[in-house]
Amino acid sequence: MRVNITLECTECGDRNYITTKNKRENPERIELKKYCPRLRRVTLHRETK
């Protein structure tokens, strides 16, 4: 079952990305390094609901 999730920048708090994940394969929260347009650099983004 795929669900929609939002990725939030851990440094500035902006919610920059919307993606999907498979809850069976990844039951824990996802953490990815993505580009933050406000800070203009790659930062850690965490899953929010």
From Swiss-Prot:
GO CC, one annotated term: ribonucleoprotein complex
SUPFAM superfamilies documented for this protein: Zn-binding ribosomal proteins (SSF57829)
Alphabetical list of Pfam families matching this protein: Ribosomal_L33
Top-level lineage group: Bacteria
Keyword set, alphabetical order: Ribonucleoprotein, Ribosomal protein
Gene Ontology BP term (one): translation
Intrachain S-S bonds: none
GO molecular function: structural constituent of ribosome
The UniProt record lists the keyword Ribonucleoprotein: yes
Similarity remark: Belongs to the bacterial ribosomal protein bL33 family.
NCBIfam families in alphabetical order: PRK00504.1, PRK00595.1, rpmG_bact
Protein name: Large ribosomal subunit protein bL33A
Name of the encoding gene: rpmG1
